[in-house]
Amino acid sequence: MSSIRLTQYSHGAGCGCKISPKVLDTILKSQIPGFDDPTLVVGNSSKDDAAVVDIGNGQGIVSTTDFFMPIVDDPFTFGRIAATNAISDIYAMGGKPIVAIAILGWPINTLAPEVAQQVIDGGRQVCHEAGISLAGGHSIDAPEPIFGLAVTGIVPLDAIKQNDTAKVGDTLYLTKPLGIGILTTAQKKGKLKPEHEQLAPNAMCTLNKIGQRFAELPGVHAMTDVTGFGLAGHLLEMCEGSGVSARLDFKALPLLDEVDYYLSEGCVPGGTLRNFDSYGDKLDAMDDRTRNILCDPQTSGGLLVAVGKESEAELLAIAAQAGLTLSPIGQLQARTGNQFIEVVQ
């Protein structure tokens, strides 16, 4: 374990560094028309996890990029988390990753190049786990450490899973526990107990490979990964894009151990309140604990899956084969009123 504390060199952490949804909407507004590409199957309009381009013969190329500042202190683990998070977007689209290139920003006068080497080695290890090469990349001298990947994948066009194609009656499942932002904030504040240090990294370093299997099921109508906008933010994107609303069973949500303890210690990421400020008016009324969990920015979070009854049993069987025990966290229903997410306690 390195003695370097990477989180002390950055103002943000992981996907909590994301620009808030409200501000991002402003940034992405443009008066300049985009190129009308008939081969672009999935682009920017649906706020999806990756772009997909039709390359013929029923196949699509999936393209994505993701990078952020350190969310843990250990350089090797940071590299693993950043790579796992970037590759996840390919799995969330139902695709298979085929190659990655690295994105590195490094304060060369502050942190030794050997530390950056550990970060890249962590990313390389995860690429190996995913069965792809880390084939190159680009680096710059930056005021804070930044690492991530640009990842390319392939997907059969009839197996693409988007975030705006959910249907009324679909059941919602989440493949990883929530609370990553809370525990990593505890670490940044120096409040994380030694016995809890691996709770969040273990989740963040788990590849969402199962998304490729879920994509084979015709009843999986929509899929996305839960990252910086929190469960509420990414579910809201699914609901708005699909023209539905969600009834969320709060007590059924999977949580990392000790989440409530660290909430009581004031370990709430700044991104939580930015998230709530961006979309809180579209949520059911809720108490602080509910808000702090639903809006908690996840880094390398789980897959949020909307599945119809015709494929639900098969989805659970695939999950069980992968060692996952999934329980439903909610249901999609017809949209009524201005609130997209109803939270049942």
Curated annotation (Swiss-Prot):
It catalyses: hydrogenselenide + ATP + H2O = selenophosphate + AMP + phosphate + 2 H(+). It holds the Pfam family AIRS. GO terms for cellular component: cytoplasm. Its EC number is 2.7.9.3. Binds 1 Mg(2+) ion per monomer. Keywords: ATP-binding, Kinase, Magnesium, Metal-binding, Nucleotide-binding, Selenium, Transferase. GO terms for biological process: selenocysteine biosynthetic process. The active site is at C15. It comes from the Bacteria. CDD domains: SelD. The keyword Nucleotide-binding applies. ATP binds at K18, S46, K47, D48, D66, D89, G137, H138, S139. Mg(2+) binds at D49, D89, D225. InterPro entries: PurM-like_C_dom, PurM-like_C_sf, PurM-like_N, PurM-like_N_sf, SelD_I, SPS/SelD. Its cofactor is Mg(2+). The keyword Transmembrane helix does not apply. HAMAP family: SelD (MF_00625). NCBIfam families: PRK00943.1 (NF002098), selD (TIGR00476). Synthesizes selenophosphate from selenide and ATP. Belongs to the selenophosphate synthase 1 family. Class I subfamily. Homodimer. This is Selenide, water dikinase.
